[in-house]
Amino acid sequence: MAETLLKSTTRHIRLFTARVENGDLVPDPEQLTLDLDPDNEFLWTEGTVTTIQTRFRDLVESYAGQPLNDYNLRRIGTELEGSIRELLQAGSLTYNPDCRVMNYSMGLPRTPELL
């Protein structure tokens, strides 16, 4: 029987119960894969990516022993979205002006004129 691929998708986070092999997702019920900001809405630094990756690892650890199901994947994705919002509000993360669509999905940019 083929393994089932579970996934959770938010605006900026995609989680899969899979591993990446040769650029393809291979279902793996023992591993979670994070796809961060697939639409390139933000400009990421190494530090901001590391912050989200660390938060992801912490969340996965905190859910150890719990069922790996849609509900728990959505909870992890929602927590990560909140972390992205915090980085944006702190000024550590900025919108990408070259993004395909500028929709300010997490609110208007924080600039001195708007504060």
From Swiss-Prot:
One of its GO terms (cellular component) is plasma membrane-derived thylakoid membrane. Keywords: Membrane, NAD, NADP, Plastoquinone, Quinone, Thylakoid, Translocase, Transport. One of its GO terms (molecular function) is oxidoreductase activity, acting on NAD(P)H, quinone or similar compound as acceptor. InterPro entries: NdhM (IPR018922). It catalyses: a plastoquinone + NADH + (n+1) H(+)(in) = a plastoquinol + NAD(+) + n H(+)(out); a plastoquinone + NADPH + (n+1) H(+)(in) = a plastoquinol + NADP(+) + n H(+)(out). Its EC number is 7.1.1.-. It is an enzyme of class 7 (translocase). NDH-1 shuttles electrons from an unknown electron donor, via FMN and iron-sulfur (Fe-S) centers, to quinones in the respiratory and/or the photosynthetic chain. The immediate electron acceptor for the enzyme in this species is believed to be plastoquinone. Couples the redox reaction to proton translocation, and thus conserves the redox energy in a proton gradient. Cyanobacterial NDH-1 also plays a role in inorganic carbon-concentration. Belongs to the complex I NdhM subunit family. NDH-1 can be composed of about 15 different subunits; different subcomplexes with different compositions have been identified which probably have different functions. PANTHER family: NAD(P)H-QUINONE OXIDOREDUCTASE SUBUNIT M, CHLOROPLASTIC. This is NAD(P)H-quinone oxidoreductase subunit M. It comes from Synechococcus sp. (strain WH7803).
